[in-house]
From Swiss-Prot:
PANTHER family: COBALT-PRECORRIN-5B C(1)-METHYLTRANSFERASE. This is Cobalt-precorrin-5B C(1)-methyltransferase. The lineage of its organism: Archaea, Thermoproteota, Thermoprotei, Sulfolobales, Sulfolobaceae. Gene3D superfamilies: CbiD-like, CbiD-like domains. Disulfide bonds: none annotated. Its EC number is 2.1.1.195. Pathway: Cofactor biosynthesis; adenosylcobalamin biosynthesis; cob(II)yrinate a,c-diamide from sirohydrochlorin (anaerobic route): step 6/10. GO terms for biological process: anaerobic cobalamin biosynthetic process; methylation. It catalyses: Co-precorrin-5B + S-adenosyl-L-methionine = Co-precorrin-6A + S-adenosyl-L-homocysteine. Keywords: Cobalamin biosynthesis, Methyltransferase, S-adenosyl-L-methionine, Transferase. The keyword Transferase applies. The gene is cbiD. It is an enzyme of class 2 (transferase).
Length: 349
């Protein structure tokens, strides 16, 4: 078999915004139009990102960077992220969302209700990129031309973000984790981990891997994207113990029997959460709020910490049962984290 190992990684909307912001600040302060800029990322890597254009005027400069999605199918691929910079009188960096950036209308998301949909991690990325240029006070306005139109074809409205796209990203890098060929990469990575460990921690995404690294050696953790079921099958044949560690929204799909969690394969997150909440005996008024929520994160805001623990214990037990049903001999453990990284449930560990 010939494996295409030259998969192209992309950049997140947050990385594109950080690069555009840095290029705009350089234009504002140095009157210089850069073709590329280098930005820091939360994981320590530095990215050199092309800049499409820089416009410099009196007291303001704007720059555009195109979102590049690599080999991930993404409706945002090629979308322009525009940042405009001007000085302010403080020593602070103020980041605001302009036209084409969505507004948060429901609770439970990382951005506060009423604010623009720019994640805290992205705000930190933008600030760190600008601080490599200046210590002065800067106002950055992030815009996305046609972002309101593009957003109509995303899931934003379903989670309470309206009027534009979200500016997101936990690492700055977009990994082609949902590609079929990625299974070959997973096989290779599992073999490497097996040389040092008799167990493996399967984490669907970056946040899950980050939280799991507080409990396990980071070298024992593999990020598998949407291919949770396939990864468990592969791992169960070579490891003494397999640990699935994830956040509620992703694992609620597994609770429903969806082992490839890509959105094209199905979605039963809120239905699963409602079902588990009924089994946990949550009050009717809380159940009503959960069924009317637009996201798992929003639904969690209506539950106490103890209620979350009871519900996620049921979810973890059902996942364990499902995994055992197709591989009864597996030594399997499920850990579900809250959105702040705290462990809500551990079953089979």
């Amino acid at each position: 078999m010939i494996i295409n190992s030259l998969k192209r990684f992309g950049i997140t909307t947050g990385a594109a915004a950080s690069a555009a912001a840095k290029a705009a600040v350089i234009g504002l302060l140095n009157r210089e139009k850069r073709n590329t800029v280098v930005i820091p990322t939360p994981i320590g890597l530095r990215l050199e990102i092309p800049v499409e254009k820089v416009e410099i005027d009196s007291g303001i400069a704007c720059a555009e960077v195109k979102k590049f999605s690599g080999d991930n199918p993404d409706i945002l691929d090629g979308l322009a992220i525009r940042c405009c910079a001007k000085l302010n009188e403080s020593n602070e960096i103020v980041i605001v969302g302009g036209k084409g950036v969505g507004k948060v209308t429901r609770s439970g998301l990382k951005a506060t209700m009423g604010e623009t949909a720019i994640s805290p991690t992205v705000r930190d990325m933008v600030i760190n990129a600008i601080r490599e240029v200046t210590d002065k006070g800067i106002q950055i306005t992030i815009e996305v031309p046609n972002g309101d139109i593009i957003a109509e074809n995303t899931l934003n409205k379903m989670v309470g973000i309206v009027g534009g796209i979200s500016i997101l990203g936990t690492t700055g890098i977009e990994t082609p984790v949902s590609d079929d060929d990625y299974l070959e990469h997973i096989k290779c990575e599992l073999n490497v981990i097996r040389q040092s460990y008799d167990f493996v921690v399967i984490a669907p995404g970056n946040s899950a891997a980050k939280y799991a690294s507080k409990l396990f050696d980071s070298n024992s953790i593999i990020k598998v994207g949407d291919r949770i079921g396939d990864s468990i099958k592969l791992a169960s044949s070579v490891f003494r113990k397999v640990i699935l560690a994830g956040l509620p929204a992703k694992l609620l799909k597994v609770y429903a029997g969806i082992f490839n969690t890509h959105f094209s394969q199905g979605d039963a997150r809120l239905e699963s959460l409602t079902h588990a909440s009924v089994l946990a005996g949550l009050p009717y008024d809380v159940l009503t709020k959960i069924t009317n929520a637009l996201s798992v994160e929003e639904a969690f805001t209506y539950m106490t910490k103890e209620q979350r623990r009871k519900v996620m214990k049921i979810v973890a037990e059902k996942i364990l049962s499902r995994i055992k049903s197709f591989n009864g001999d597996i030594n399997f453990c499920v850990i579900i984290f809250d959105y702040d990284g705290e462990s809500l449930s551990r079953v089979g560990c």
